[in-house]
Amino acid sequence: MPETASATRRHLRRAARSRGVSVAAPQLDFDWASRFLQRRTVPSVEMITGDQIERVVWLDTRRRPVAARAVRLCIRNELPRRTTTRQTIGRLTIAATPDLSAATLRAAIVRMFDLDADLGSFLAIARRDPVLAPVVATNPRGLRLLQLLDPFEALLRAILGQQVSVAAASTMTDRLVRRVGTPGPRAWTSDVVPLLRPRYAFPRPGAVAELGPARLRGLGLTRAKAAAVHGAATAVASGQLNLARLRVASPDEADRMLLSLPGVGPWTATYVRLRALGDRDAFPAADLGLIRALTALGVTRDRFQAAAERWRPWRGYATLHLWHSLGSGVPVLA
């Protein structure tokens, strides 16, 4: 019998507390982070329930690609839901099945929430800037660049999100995962958590490549999008696009690597840098949400780049706050 949402939350809470690792999360507005992630949830992979996140991910547990395995993570916000603006030091608890070392868990959560970013340096620039000052003032608890641990997932989600709504992109992604995703661990332990909704890790590149463009179109993708997804998967599976090299590439090199793929343009490449490569200076100048936000703040199109130059090396964080200024906290695309 399927469990209720409240029962699921209780099970996740027990799992996270029973064997979790606690990590300080300064200047993190978890309510905002939860809304950001909920809006783009892929149900077969992840579940967000307010103060908790459960996700099946590919995690390199021995720092070698061949050691990557599907892991179920449970992340819980230990900060009280209602906080004052002075309470900026929160804590996150992370647990995993199969069990992982404390160091591996800490590294994962720091990366997912970009917790090692010195937001003080960004805010020092933003609070002096005529465009950003009123924007950052509206969120004193802090926004952080939320990261996907798998660059391949970020790449495919960016392609699937081209020129469609967030909901449509999530639906297509979920269909792909259900078709060729890798089954993940089903429970924390038999006496703690029964079967939970997220059941799969994101598909491996080879599995997506084997589908071929025709079967990808059967999932609701356009001809062009199916070709782009297949091309990206084939490039990664064959080694033409080396994800290990992409992770450590300079921004210019990362752009060259990504833009060499069919159907990948500047917006998609920048999105991958923002969401998977931890590039805090990535700036998607052509993003419609960013354009709307800057226009609403009185910055004309011919002054976008000049304004952005003042925000280096934090243009990615400036982008995040500008998106948030629109009210939704997310870009127009996926």
Give, region by region, the residue ranges found by the protein language model.
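HhH-family (HhH-GPD) DNA N-glycosylase catalytic core used in base-excision repair
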Residues: 1-334
